Structures are given as structure tokens and as C-alpha cells.
């Protein structure tokens, strides 16, 4: 699933090509995504212009003249900018055609993505108003994590992946941040002190920042808006490296399922 760095990479890729452009037409080939694409979307968007491209957690916010498109890439979604004469593929479900002969094409093989429309403040939309703070903003720090982890019985890994606690931290980057912080993913969130949470907040920010700079992580099918893979996979310390030696101590990296998600850790370096 595209996580925060991948979504931010897409945002940066499409923004300069959308802002100021008018929407000529909208083509919906398959409306049955995670939630059906609203039938009114086609008519609502024609003639509007893009004003900005934002992000909240893993959601893209395409601000238009009269409202906002809220788009989630789901498990396998991608956005590409193509010319209008580019043949569409089997999983190209939506085209937003611009007035310059190009179109924003949404591809989603597994159809877990979503495209919503709101004319109200998008941050008050039910999908967004429940989200915790952005992990790269100042509100997200060790004091915040310590305060919100008290009396929680969940594991620290599940805790930092809870989008109500912090927006956009998925499985890949949770594994990496916990490794760099030296915290075992199974450790109870309520049994971690302030100093260790300060370290975890720092490593989370570092991992996410570095991933954004590398264009995200491509493990299976993530591509940037210009069709290129993300290169942070080359920098992963622990994710996907089961039985490989720990880059710090050489102990074989262990893999187990925690909360139905693949969790990688070093038995010597993480406690």
C-alpha cells in the first residue's frame, strides 16, 4: 500500500501539472472502487480549475474552483499524467482530462482506492477529521506519543500505525522507525517512557523524510506520476530482510506477524 512518502511523492509530481489547469472532461470507466465514484462527479468537475494539490495522511486533496477531490490510492493505486491519446489499460478506471491535451489517469488493479468529492472544508470530511497529526509536523513529538500511549494495551507498532494517533505511518516505515529507535514492535505502548518516545518520534520523522527524498519505496507496483519507481527500497534497514544479518549487530533479522502485519526486528538491538 502506498504510504505517506509515496503519496507525498505523487503530490509533488502532479501539482505543477494541475494547478491553474481547467478540467475539460471526466471519463469514468469503472466506478466500483472501495466506495462507488459519485455519479455527479463527471458533471461537477467539467469547467472547474485546479487551485492546489494537498495531502492529509495518505489522502490526496485536489482543490478545485468549487470543491475538493479526496483521493486515496488504496492498496495498488497510482496516478499518472499522460496525453489524451495514450491507450488506456485494463485497470485505468478514471481520467480527468485537462484543457492542454493531457489527463490525470487513475489506475487501481485491486480497486481498494477511492475518489470522493466535497464542497465543504475537506478537513472536516468524515474520512479526514478522524486523523491524528501529520508525523512531519511539530505537534508530533515524544511528548505527544507518551501522553496518548498511557493506559493502552496495544503494541507500540500498532499504536504508531493507528491513523487516529498519527496520520500516514504504514507498515514499512513503522518497522524501520522502530528498528532505528531500538524498540521491539511487540512492546506495550503504555510501557515505553518519554525518552524512548522522543527517540521514536525522531526516527519516524527521519525515515519518512528520507523516503520522500528518495521518491518513496517500490516493492511491487508503486510508480511515481511519471512512471518511475521509488528508490527508498535500496535504503531499507530491516523491512523485507528476514534472516538477513542485522546491519548493526549481525544477528539474523526475525519476521513474525503482529496484528496481521509483517513485522521485522532484531532480537538483540530492539527491546
UniProtKB/Swiss-Prot annotation:
Pfam families: Fapy_DNA_glyco, H2TH, zf-FPG_IleRS. It catalyses: Hydrolysis of DNA containing ring-opened 7-methylguanine residues, releasing 2,6-diamino-4-hydroxy-5-(N-methyl)formamidopyrimidine; 2'-deoxyribonucleotide-(2'-deoxyribose 5'-phosphate)-2'-deoxyribonucleotide-DNA = a 3'-end 2'-deoxyribonucleotide-(2,3-dehydro-2,3-deoxyribose 5'-phosphate)-DNA + a 5'-end 5'-phospho-2'-deoxyribonucleoside-DNA + H(+). Keywords: DNA damage, DNA repair, DNA-binding, Glycosidase, Hydrolase, Lyase, Metal-binding, Multifunctional enzyme, Zinc, Zinc-finger. Monomer. The active site is at 2 (schiff-base intermediate with dna), 3 (proton donor), 58 (proton donor), 261 (proton donor). The keyword Cell wall biogenesis/degradation does not apply. Belongs to the FPG family. The keyword Amino-acid biosynthesis does not apply. A zinc finger (FPG-type) spans 237-271. HAMAP family: Fapy_DNA_glycosyl (MF_00103). Its cofactor is Zn(2+). This is Formamidopyrimidine-DNA glycosylase. InterPro entries: DNA_glyclase/AP_lyase_DNA-bd (IPR015886), DNA_glyclase_Znf_dom_DNA_BS (IPR015887), Formamido-pyr_DNA_Glyclase (IPR020629), FPG_cat (IPR012319), MutM-like_N-ter (IPR035937), Ribosomal_uS13-like_H2TH (IPR010979), Znf_DNA_glyclase/AP_lyase (IPR000214), Znf_FPG/IleRS (IPR010663). Disulfide bonds: none annotated. It comes from Nitrosococcus oceani (strain ATCC 19707 / BCRC 17464 / JCM 30415 / NCIMB 11848 / C-107). DNA binds at residues 91, 110, 152. Binds 1 zinc ion per subunit. GO terms for molecular function: 8-oxo-7,8-dihydroguanine DNA N-glycosylase activity; class I DNA-(apurinic or apyrimidinic site) endonuclease activity; damaged DNA binding; zinc ion binding. GO terms for biological process: base-excision repair. SUPFAM superfamilies: Glucocorticoid receptor-like (DNA-binding domain), N-terminal domain of MutM-like DNA repair proteins, S13-like H2TH domain. It comes from the Bacteria. Involved in base excision repair of DNA damaged by oxidation or by mutagenic agents. Acts as a DNA glycosylase that recognizes and removes damaged bases. Has a preference for oxidized purines, such as 7,8-dihydro-8-oxoguanine (8-oxoG). Has AP (apurinic/apyrimidinic) lyase activity and introduces nicks in the DNA strand. Cleaves the DNA backbone by beta-delta elimination to generate a single-strand break at the site of the removed base with both 3'- and 5'-phosphates. Its EC number is 3.2.2.23, 4.2.99.18.
Amino acid at each position: 500500500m502506498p504510504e505517506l512518502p509515496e503519496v507525498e511523492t505523487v503530490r509533488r509530481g502532479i501539482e505543477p501539472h494541475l494547478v491553474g489547469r481547467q478540467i475539460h472532461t471526466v471519463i469514468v470507466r469503472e466506478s466500483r472502487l472501495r466506495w462507488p465514484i459519485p455519479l455527479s462527479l463527471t458533471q461537477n468537475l467539467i469547467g472547474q480549475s485546479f487551485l492546489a494539490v494537498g495531502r492529509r495522511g495518505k489522502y490526496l486533496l485536489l482543490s478545485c474552483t468549487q470543491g475538493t477531490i479526496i483521493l486515496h490510492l488504496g492498496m495498488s493505486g497510482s496516478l499518472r499524467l499522460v496525453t489524451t491519446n495514450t491507450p488506456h489499460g485494463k485497470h485505468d478506471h478514471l481520467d480527468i482530462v485537462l484543457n492542454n491535451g493531457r489527463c490525470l489517469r487513475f489506475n487501481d488493479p485491486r480497486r481498494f482506492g477511492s475518489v470522493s468529492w466535497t464542497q465543504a472544508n475537506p478537513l472536516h470530511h468524515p474520512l479526514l477529521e478522524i486523523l491524528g497529526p501529520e508525523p512531519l509536523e511539530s505537534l508530533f513529538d515524544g511528548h505527544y506519543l507518551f501522553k496518548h500511549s498511557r493506559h493502552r494495551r496495544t503494541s507500540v507498532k500498532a499504536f504508531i500505525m493507528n491513523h487516529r494517533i498519527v496520520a500516514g505511518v504504514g507498515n514499512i516505515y513503522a518497522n524501520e522507525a522502530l528498528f532505528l529507535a531500538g524498540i521491539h514492535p511487540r512492546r506495550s505502548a503504555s510501557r515505553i517512557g518519554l525518552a524512548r518516545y522522543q527517540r521514536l518520534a525522531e526516527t519516524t520523522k527521519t525515515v519518512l523524510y528520507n523516503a520522500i527524498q528518495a521518491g518513496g519505496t517500490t516493492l511491487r507496483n508503486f510508480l511515481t506520476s511519471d512512471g518511475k519507481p521509488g528508490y527508498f527500497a535500496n535504503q531499507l534497514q530491516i523491512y523485507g530482510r528476514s534472516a538477513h544479518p542485522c546491519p548493526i549487530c549481525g544477528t539474523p533479522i526475525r519476521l513474525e506477524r503482529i496484528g496481521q502485519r509483517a513485522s521485522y526486528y532484531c532480537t538483540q538491538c530492539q527491546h
